[in-house]
Amino acid sequence: MIKLKSPQDIEGLKVCGALSKEALRLTGEMVRPGISTWELDKFCEDFIRMHGGVPGFKGYGGFPGTICASINDEVVHGIPSRDRILCEGDIISIDTGATVNGWVGDNAWTFAVGHISDDRKALLEVTRDCLALAIEQAVPGNHLGDIGYAVQSHAQKHGYGVIREYVGHGIGRKMHEEPNVPNYGHRGFGIKLEIGMV
């Protein structure tokens, strides 16, 4: 069941979202050749705790880290480790979130490690544009399929596919709330988006 959020709820989500965003941004600034994903994880956890939050991922479903650190072709949920050292030319997707006052934040971004190939730059540009197009579709009155269609059609137009096994999701008091938000779909299909959906 989709839980619509009140304006007060959304203010609570903005607080945890702001902390999650800043934790991700600063962790991303540390990305460089030679750093371990464990060091990134440690920094992110310390930052979240220092600013009154609790790492949202640590212990969630048994996950051991504060960040998911997925390198190159690893799709998602990469486990941070002292042995996973970033190399020049890698790309790393960092996914993290903070819980503040019972509200959960969750965000991810893919960072370049030093200089990356033109192919990897193109991938990052297309996925960034897919995100922007998806956000444009996330308005009351549109359908869930409009979001997925925007992502899928733009990716395919540029020669990429989408991962069907993992989806975006609602968020609130729990990390994963309804609805699931696939990166594929058809215009005008699926649930109608309403004010208060997050």
Q: What does each model-found stretch correspond to?
A:
Residues 1-198:
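Active-site neighborhoods and metal-handling regions in enzymes and metal-associated proteins
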